[in-house]
């Protein structure tokens, strides 16, 4: 059974830093009369019955010719199926040992906003051979994302929105963030306003049930990472009788407010950054050693970037303080990236911001040709729809000191959440996640996860009727694949339904 560097399933449900147009505190705003009213899909009112899949060879599956592709039409609104339809893009990776096949396992990589269909192509990397022997892997692009249509489409040039200097330390910088947030929202409404009321987590959870029905299975297994934990827990709460087994890795607290989860994330990233800098100060081989004073050097560098951003290219955003914070956030998802961050910070001290810009680009999934997918746009649209939060600029500003109190270095970057405060679509009605009637659900947390801190993962396990918590001691986001201990516990549960002992800890 293999282990590997885990998948970095970003974005998490709340924003990582303010350069994301500060998505912490997403929710409904003072909404215009034309904004849509959203309700959670009901499981009894909708007469919608999905068609079966017509699987065909894929034209984009790089890893194996066995992967098949299909589509599934689902309604915008399950309570009003005539309102319009999404066409979900779905991939099937058949079990590699048909004689051992148990059934289908749906998988989601996180987000929200990430298309997940590629997990079928890369199943051999993400999952053990025991799992791929026993399960058909079903991976899909949730409504509004990836190759599912229509997809959220807001802007083409991220730099003009996310490269701004942040946190703001002048009225002019603050107004620039507000203006950029409003402009981004306006573009989203202009290009995708028709679908924005219909891409909530609850709607995607209902799509999962439609996919199950289209597969012809009474019960189904599920493996979700990061935000995929919230999606899976929502599905298990709405359709408990259809759950065979479910694993939620890098789990969020599903019933927290966006402010509470934002505070937890700010504290988590602050803690990981402190761990990184302390380790660097103790290790002369660290490229950002600075005579054992990495912490002071980091603070000084960020002040320098605030005063004088580094220009890497005339065609790109300068490396502002906000860009640097994004780069740091990217590296905090796993200590695998820490050596890259060491060099990037050291280079920036010498006036070269290319390394920080590369990490920034990696965070935003910038492609080699300079284009972007729609991940961040869909992330914003889904997050703002899902989470009631600050509904005015003043409310956002008033919350910032609380973020700074729990995270002195990074807190302000989490606190400024203008985009969702200005979002033009009313928030969806949330359901309380309980998993009641779904049976045992395995929840995985790591001790050094900044994006979904262990404290939040514990809350997920506690709020589920039968949540089983597994802990991995590691500095990374998500735990499956880290070592044989966690793989064995998870695989035995999914394959044999052997429920592990809660609070089991796996050490790297």
Predicted regions and their residues:
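Short helix-capping/linker segments at secondary-structure and domain boundaries
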Residues: 332-351, 389-394
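C-terminal motif of bacterial Sec signal peptides marking the signal peptidase cleavage site
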Residues: 22-25
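Gly/Pro-rich cap/lid or specificity-loop segments adjacent to the active site
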Residues: 40-323, 381-508
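Flexible "cap/lid" loop of the alpha/beta hydrolase fold
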Residues: 252-270, 343-344, 353-368
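Structural motif
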Residues: 310-326, 332-337, 369-377
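Bacterial N-terminal signal peptides that target proteins for export
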Residues: 2-15
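Long, low-complexity segments enriched in small/aliphatic residues
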Residues: 354-387, 391-394
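Bacterial signal peptide processing site
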Residues: 27-30
């Amino acid at each position: 059974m293999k282990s590997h560097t885990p998948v970095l399933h970003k974005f998490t449900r709340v924003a990582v830093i303010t350069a994301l147009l500060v998505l912490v505190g997403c929710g409904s705003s003072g909404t215009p009369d034309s904004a849509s009213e959203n309700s959670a899909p009901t499981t009894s009112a909708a007469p919608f019955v999905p068609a079966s899949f017509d699987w065909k060879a894929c034209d984009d599956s790089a890893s194996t010719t066995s992967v098949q592709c299909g589509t599934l039409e689902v309604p915008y609104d399950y309570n009003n199926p005539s309102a319009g339809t999404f066409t979900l893009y779905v991939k099937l990776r058949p079990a590699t040992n048909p004689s051992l096949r148990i059934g289908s396992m749906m998988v989601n990589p996180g987000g929200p906003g990430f298309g997940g269909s590629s997990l079928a192509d890369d199943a051999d990397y993400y999952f053990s051979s025991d799992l791929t022997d026993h399960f058909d892997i079903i991976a899909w692009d949730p409504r509004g994302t990836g190759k599912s249509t229509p997809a959220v489409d807001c802007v083409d040039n991220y730099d003009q929105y996310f490269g701004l200097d942040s946190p703001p330390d002048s009225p002019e910088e603050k107004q620039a963030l507000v203006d950029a947030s409003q402009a981004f929202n306006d573009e989203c409404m202009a290009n995708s306003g028709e679908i924005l009321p219909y891409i909530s987590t609850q709607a995607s959870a209902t799509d999962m049930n439609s996919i199950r029905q289209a597969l012809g299975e009474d019960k189904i297994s599920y493996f979700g990472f990061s935000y995929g934990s919230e999606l899976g827990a929502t599905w298990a709460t709405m359709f408990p009788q259809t759950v065979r087994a479910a694993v939620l890795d890098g789990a969020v607290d599903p019933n927290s407010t966006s402010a509470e989860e934002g505070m937890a994330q700010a504290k988590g990233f602050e803690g990981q950054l402190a761990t990184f800098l302390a380790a660097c100060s103790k290790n002369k081989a660290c490229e950002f050693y600075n005579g054992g004073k990495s912490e002071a050097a980091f603070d000084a560098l960020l002040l320098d970037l605030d005063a004088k951003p580094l220009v890497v290219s005339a065609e790109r955003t300068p490396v502002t303080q906000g860009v640097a914070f994004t780069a740091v956030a990217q590296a905090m998802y796993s200590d695998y990236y820490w050596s890259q961050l060491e060099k990037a910070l050291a280079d920036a001290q010498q006036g070269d911001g290319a390394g920080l810009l590369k990490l920034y680009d990696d965070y935003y999934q910038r492609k080699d040709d300079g284009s972007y997918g729609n991940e961040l746009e869909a992330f914003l649209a889904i997050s703002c729809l899902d989470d009631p939060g600050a509904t005015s600029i003043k409310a956002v500003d008033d919350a910032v000191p609380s973020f700074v109190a729990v995270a002195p270095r990074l807190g302000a970057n989490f606190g400024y959440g203008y985009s969702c405060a200005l979002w033009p679509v009313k928030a969806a009605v949330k359901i309380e996640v309980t998993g009641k009637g779904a049976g045992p659900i395995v929840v995985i947390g790591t001790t050094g996860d900044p994006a979904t801190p262990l404290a939040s993962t514990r809350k997920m396990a506690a709020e589920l009727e039968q949540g089983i918590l597994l802990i991995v001691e590691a500095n990374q986001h998500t735990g499956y694949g880290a070592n044989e201990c966690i793989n064995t516990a998870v695989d035995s549960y999914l394959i044999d339904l052997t429920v592990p002992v809660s609070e089991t800890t796996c050490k790297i």
